[in-house]
Curated annotation (Swiss-Prot):
This is Hydrogenase-2 large chain. The lineage of its organism: Bacteria, Pseudomonadati, Pseudomonadota, Gammaproteobacteria, Enterobacterales. SUPFAM superfamilies: HydB/Nqo4-like (SSF56762). The record marks 552-553 as: Cleavage. Heterodimer of a large and a small subunit. Its cofactor is Ni(2+). The gene is hybC. It catalyses: H2 + A = AH2. It comes from Escherichia coli (strain K12).
Length: 567
């Protein structure tokens, strides 16, 4: 007998997401992912100066602000054929790497970890045993018995108060929770320590960007960071050294805590290396430009079809015609007019809500495709593309996680197992580890270039008063490939579309009725208790949904409390 469960809204994500599943014999047989809010930001920037768009569209989201700002600036620079000073590229790259580091740490600890960690079980842990478990795999200075005892006492105080505070409403004691008490205690301690690490990442962003969220230093043509090593109120030597101190602290936490915790979770939940396979077509764009024309990058891009790394097709630049021509969005199952597939430059965002229907329209998210195929974007796609491209650093970072996994389990971990729920989490960790090298590299590049006497950070753009110009700004954001598509006509924006990572991944069935990546990833997932569908939430959280970005103002009648309906 089949059952229907509805989770509305899914929590510990950004925005509002509803998931519906049909369950037969304890396993998900069908799924629907529904974005339940409408954004409409594209309509707001029409008829405005293209230099203003980045400041507005970063308000699409309070989490992904920096990525939208930079993607929008790149779109305008693409349309106007502007060469960006390399100092501006270095500064932008440092901001993006620090922002993404922050985002990945937030996802693992604050948004995803509580799907795997039983907070109450940590009360039974032996702090000394917990500390001993980490010897040989981590040198983190806060892995001492004394530190773990302090954390355990905090949990005891919360339980004694009758309120678990930030740890309330978890599925504690769920049969799918498998970590021993000591590992649960370690995870809670690192959850709390991660909060301070996130502050360090944001300090890097704020020192260069003016503030965060919603940075202030970008400009079409570069950045608004005047450089004078001896000056005041500018990017000087003191501020640069301050930034470097936070970069060094970030690297220590990522390498000694985040990387190790990822391997530990995988070691105790190996079955989740076989669950959660999504679209198996993967798309990622090159990132971290090192020249003024966005033609040379530190990270490669590419496309992989049907989980076959040998099918890898390189994408070498943001102006790659193969990339640009392959992207379309349709709205057959979304609450918009113009259902047929459209290129983003021609796309519209006109709402047409007519109720929720299994076989009809059921989401505010559109359905992007790449040459007609559903694809997954994000850290898993990014990792697989870089592995297929032969990037040595990516393989080395993955090998380090696999080595810890092997030490704990005695088993190896194959690439084929990465097409999974835990594969996405591992991909995100590999990406974050590589970002620490990017931060060091781009900081050194900036210092070296300044030392050569180049202090240029901005070139004034020329916006023709007549004529039409099209541009697209691609960016590999924390959740995957982001693109902003801008049409400038007679000096102002005539059309604007954002095709964001969570649109690619959370999109409903497309024009050909193919299911979206979220929906595909849930099929085959076992659910032990339909009233507590932890297994469903684990896989959805592995994508790190950001629905404020994905949808095209929140319903005033929306629930703030999670509702799980079993029919």
């Amino acid at each position: 007998m089949s059952q229907r469960i509805t989770i509305d809204p899914v929590t510990r994500i950004e925005g509002h997401l509803r998931i519906d599943c049909e369950i037969e014999n304890g396993v998900v047989s069908k799924a629907w992912a529904s974005g339940t809010m409408w954004r409409g930001m594209e309509e707001i920037v029409k008829n405005r100066d293209p230099r203003d768009a980045w400041m507005i569209v970063q308000r699409i989201c309070g989490v992904c602000t920096t990525t939208h700002a930079l993607s929008s600036v790149r779109a305008a620079e693409s349309a106007l054929n502007i060469d960006v000073p390399v100092n501006a590229q270095y500064i932008r790259n440092i901001i993006l790497a620090a922002h993404t580091t922050h985002d990945h740490i937030v996802h693992f600890y604050q948004l995803s970890a509580l799907d795997w960690v039983d907070i109450t079980s940590a009360l039974q842990a032996d702090p000394t045993k917990a500390s001993e478990m980490l010897k040989g795999v981590s040198t983190w200075h806060l892995n001492s018995p004394e530190e773990f005892t302090k954390v355990q006492n905090k949990i005891k105080d919360l339980v004694a108060s009758g309120q678990l505070g930030i740890f309330a409403n978890g599925y504690w004691g769920h049969p799918a929770m498998k970590l021993p008490p000591e590992v649960n205690l370690i995870a809670v301690a690192h959850y709390l320590q991660a909060l301070e690490c996130q502050r360090d990442a944001n300090r890097v962003v704020a020192l260069l960007g003016g503030k965060t969220p919603h940075i202030q230093n970008l400009a079409v043509g570069g950045v608004a960071n005047p450089i004078n090593l001896d000056g005041l109120g500018v990017l000087n030597l003191e501020r640069l050294m301050y930034i470097k101190s936070f970069i060094d602290k970030l690297s220590d936490f990522v390498e000694q805590v985040y990387k190790v915790d990822t391997a530990v979770i995988a070691a105790f939940y190996p079955e989740w290396l076989t669950r959660g396979k999504g679209a198996v077509n993967y798309l990622s764009v090159p990132e971290f430009p090192t020249d003024s024309k966005n033609g040379s990058f530190l990270f490669p891009g590419g496309y992989i079809e049907n989980a076959d790394l040998s099918s890898y097709r390189p994408i070498t630049s943001h102006s790659d015609e193969y990339l640009i021509k392959g992207i379309q969005e349709s709205a057959k199952h979304s609450w918009y007019k113009d259902e047929a597939p459209q290129a983003p430059w021609e796309g519209t965002t006109i709402p047409a809500y007519d109720g929720w229907s299994d076989d009809g329209k059921y989401s505010w998210v559109k359905s992007p495709t790449f040459y007609g195929k559903t694809v997954e974007v994000g850290p898993l796609a990014n990792m697989l593309v870089k592995l297929a491209a032969g990037r040595e650093s990516t393989q080395n970072k993955l090998n380090e996680i696999v080595a810890i996994y092997q030490k704990l389990t005695g088993n190896t971990l194959e690439v084929a197992q990465l097409h999974s729920t835990l594969g996405r989490i591992i991909g995100r960790t590999v990406h974050c580890c590589e970002l620490q090298d990017i931060l060091q590299n781009q900081y050194s590049a900036l210092i070296t270039n300044i030392g050569k006497g180049d202090h240029t950070t901005f070139v004034k753009p020329n916006i023709p008063a007549t004529g039409e110009f099209k541009g697209v700004g691609f960016l590999e954001a924390p959740r995957g490939m982001l693109s902003h598509w801008m049409v400038i006509k007679d000096g102002i924006i005539s059309n604007y579309q954002a095709v964001v990572p969570s649109t690619w991944n959370s999109g409903p069935r497309n024009f050909n009725d193919d299911v979206g990546p979220y929906e595909q990833s849930l099929v085959g997932t076992p659910v032990a208790d339909p009233n507590k569908p932890l297994e469903v939430v684990r896989t959805i959280h592995s994508f790190d949904p950001c629905m404020a970005c994905a949808v095209h103002v929140v319903d005033a009648d929306g629930n703030e409390v999670v509702s799980v309906k079993v029919l």
